[in-house]
Amino acid sequence: MGSINNYISENNHVEIIGIPTTDEGLPVRDCIRALRSRGLLRLFVEGGGDTVTRFFNGGTLDRLQISVAPTVFGSGRPGLRLPPTPTAQEAFRPKQCSHFQLGDDILFDFELEKVWPSK
């Protein structure tokens, strides 16, 4: 796989922002700060378990959408990994939850704004 520069030309009006990675991967808060400094106020992130977990655990999401399909894959990487919760009072609870039927699938839409436990 080549460099991203092979796929994006200057004619696309694209700015490539370099964010140094850490041992844990891409620091999502640094990504958000870099985008906000350029005037971007909303960001749609679509990804698998690692990406969603990184943004969720980083406290950078204000909305989370998870679709559930009637398909059994067996063992594998979980869709969302969270640290253990010692008590029910400390459990994560979305501000609002809606669900939508999409054929045989169900989409859960969680509003996360201002629901993070205080530390």
Predicted regions mapped to residue ranges:
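Enzymes that bind and transform nitrogen-containing heteroaromatic metabolites
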Residues: 1-119
